[in-house]
Each structure stands twice: as structure tokens, then as C-alpha cells.
């Protein structure tokens, strides 16, 4: 979340502040603990808390987008129905109930340009597993099996298989 500190950061509801990947405290403040989302086109996570999307500025979470007409799917964590890389580039979409008619879903996607060209996140097996766990168990955001963030040089090329065309020629 913080481009000033390379690597993953961690925080929780049970401890004060944010810690870097070495366990060093980097902030006395912390963002919400609901969901992380790739949204605005840089390589840092954004924070999704209810229907508010925030960007960490090194000291606090600043709202960059709200999802009008959206309703979260539970009362305790206020999570989306699902967050996933569903369409287009590598950034994620969020799906919420329609606030006026919960029998309908609303899908939100970003229109912010990005200079980063990555393949769809669904090619990563760990990420696909994360999409499945959102709807079969404890609703948590998906995570990649590799690092995306400040200093990204190369990401592993996905193992992709296609059907053999000669199977269809018989």
C-alpha cells in the first residue's frame, strides 16, 4: 500500500500501526482491514472498506472513489460480494448488491489509464483459488502467488495450456 516501503506491509485490528516485510513499524496509523484491490493503475494496493475505496498516503487512507448505489454483503466486515480481475487488463473489478434491489448485482470497474502491462491475474493459480474462497468460506480478498508493487521488474510467465487442434480434426 505504501510505495515508500518496498515489499508487503501488514496490519491488523489487534495491533497498532503498519509493519513492513521485516517486521519494522512504519506507521502509527493504519487503514481499514477489509479488502485490498488493484484499482488506480499503479502497482500498489488500494483499500476497499465497505463501499469506499482509499489510497494510503503514508500516514492515512484517503478516499479516492465511492461506489454509488452499492451495498456490501455482510454487516461485520462490509465486504463486496466478490473482488476479482474479471474483465480487461490486470486491475480488479468489485461486485456489490444493488442498494435499491438486493436481487441485482452491480459490477464496478476502473477507467483510470495505466502504464503497466500485465497479463490477467486469473492466470495465476493462487489468485484463482482466492476468487473461489471468497464465495465458499470466509470472505477475504484474493492474493497473488507473486509480488506486484514498487520495484516490479519481471513477473513469472503463466503456464497456459490450449487444446490440441488435431483432436478436433477426426
Language-model features and meaning:
Residues 1-170:
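Beta-propeller-forming repeat regions
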